[in-house]
């Protein structure tokens, strides 16, 4: 019963951190406890159909807070997104240099380990070009874990947590007909986006469907709180389960690279986030999460847990995903062409398993 065990451990961590008042405790706690259990050798796993269902549910909840008030300042988004794209490129360059100079990684592994997000594509390229798959995976997963735990705590420490985004819609379903319409439209939009291979298609498709219905004032309901909480807990478990098949010894061997690269990427992201806050009328918490170098789906769940503006955060993470995906693919293939026969690193072995995003 590994799935039941995973969900129980996730619930223990998520509810526990929530009860002690930790911001975003559901996603942070579930990810932390599942990650620790996976490192301890427990078989942590979430079935793909269940994970996909939760992506759709979270997308519906994110879209439920869309209202004219949440789109205030949308005209200034292009400048903010442009700065984010520049920040992503600077993060990759700085972190690549760090991994090369400090930890001696080969150029290709350093580039792929430095990518802020786009983990599925990065792991595919790592396996295709025989890079240090396990090291790259650990650096990426540790970065997400540190962000999910550190961001809420940091925002709370500096008094930057925000009240829930107020919507004109009720958050408890009072009409089963409207709820059925909401779920049906959002699910169809999610499936269409998935079929089109849109980045984060299930979550963004459901967000688009739900956001349209709520923004157009066509429905006035959302999912009950328990459904949203269960979805957030489960997606936290999905992120934590990425530590499966990683021994503590292997984790420790890459810990320096993980923490160091996280510090470099965070410093670059923070400098650009401060620039945006100084120039544009956005809340600090929204900007911080939008510029955080974490996985797109996890950052959207974190935005929901912290009651942030999902449209602003989602638009920025989508833009970063597209920019990083293109840049990494081009740069990786250039590196391979320049050194087609050069071995990557003494620890790299063909066939080392890759993590899926």
Predicted regions and their residues:
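Alpha-helical membrane segments and immediately flanking helix-loop junctions
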Residues: 102-142, 282-316
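Core mid-bundle transmembrane helix pairs that form the ion/substrate translocation pathway
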Residues: 7, 11, 146-149, 160-218
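Membrane-interface helix termini and inter-helical loops of multi-pass transporters
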Residues: 68-76, 157-174, 216-223, 249, ...
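Membrane-embedded alpha-helical segments of transport systems
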Residues: 117-122, 137-156, 268, 296-298, ...
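Entry/N-cap segments of selected transmembrane alpha helices
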Residues: 2-9, 15, 66-97, 179, ...
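Hydrophobic transmembrane alpha-helices of secondary-active transporters
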Residues: 31-76, 209-215, 225-252
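Structural signature of hydrophobic alpha-helical transmembrane segments
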Residues: 16-32, 51-55, 77-88, 109-114, ...
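Flexible hinge motifs at transmembrane-helix junctions and intramembrane kinks/re-entrant loops
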Residues: 14-28, 36, 40-51, 190-204, ...
């Amino acid at each position: 019963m590994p799935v039941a065990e995973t969900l129980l451990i996730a619930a223990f961590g998520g509810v526990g951190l929530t009860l002690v008042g930790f911001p975003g405790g559901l996603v942070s706690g579930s990810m932390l406890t599942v990650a620790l259990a996976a490192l301890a050798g427990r078989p942590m796993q979430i079935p793909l159909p269940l994970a996909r269902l939760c992506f759709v549910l979270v997308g519906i909840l994110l879209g439920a807070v869309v209202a004219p008030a949440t789109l205030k300042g949308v005209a200034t988004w292009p400048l903010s997104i442009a700065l984010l794209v520049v920040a992503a490129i600077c993060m990759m360059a700085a972190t690549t240099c760090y991994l090369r100079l400090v930890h001696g990684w080969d150029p290709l592994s350093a580039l792929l380990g430095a990518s802020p997000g786009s983990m599925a594509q990065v792991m595919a390229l790592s396996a295709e070009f025989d890079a240090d798959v396990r090291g790259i995976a650990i650096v990426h997963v540790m970065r997400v874990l540190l962000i999910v735990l550190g961001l809420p705590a940091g925002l709370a420490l500096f008094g930057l947590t925000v009240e829930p985004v107020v919507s004109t819609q009720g958050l408890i379903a009072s009409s089963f007909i409207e709820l059925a319409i909401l779920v049906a439209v959002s699910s169809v939009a999610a499936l269409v986006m998935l079929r089109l291979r849109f980045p984060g298609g299930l979550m963004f498709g459901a967000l688009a469907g739900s956001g349209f219905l709520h923004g157009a004032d066509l429905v006035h309901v959302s999912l009950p709180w328990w459904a949203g909480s269960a979805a957030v807990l489960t997606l936290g478990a999905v992120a934590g389960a990425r530590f499966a098949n990683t021994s503590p010894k292997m984790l420790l061997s890459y810990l320096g690279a993980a923490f160091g690269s996280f510090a470099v990427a965070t410093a670059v992201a923070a400098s650009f986030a401060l620039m945006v806050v100084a120039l544009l009328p956005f809340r600090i918490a929204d900007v911080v999460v939008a510029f955080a170098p974490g996985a797109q789906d996890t950052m959207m769940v974190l935005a929901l847990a912290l009651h942030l503006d999902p449209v602003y955060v989602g638009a920025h993470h989508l833009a970063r995903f597209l920019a990083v995906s293109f840049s990494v693919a081009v740069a990786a293939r250039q590196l391979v062409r320049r050194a087609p026969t050069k071995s990557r690193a003494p620890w790299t072995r063909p066939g080392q398993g890759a993590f899926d995003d």
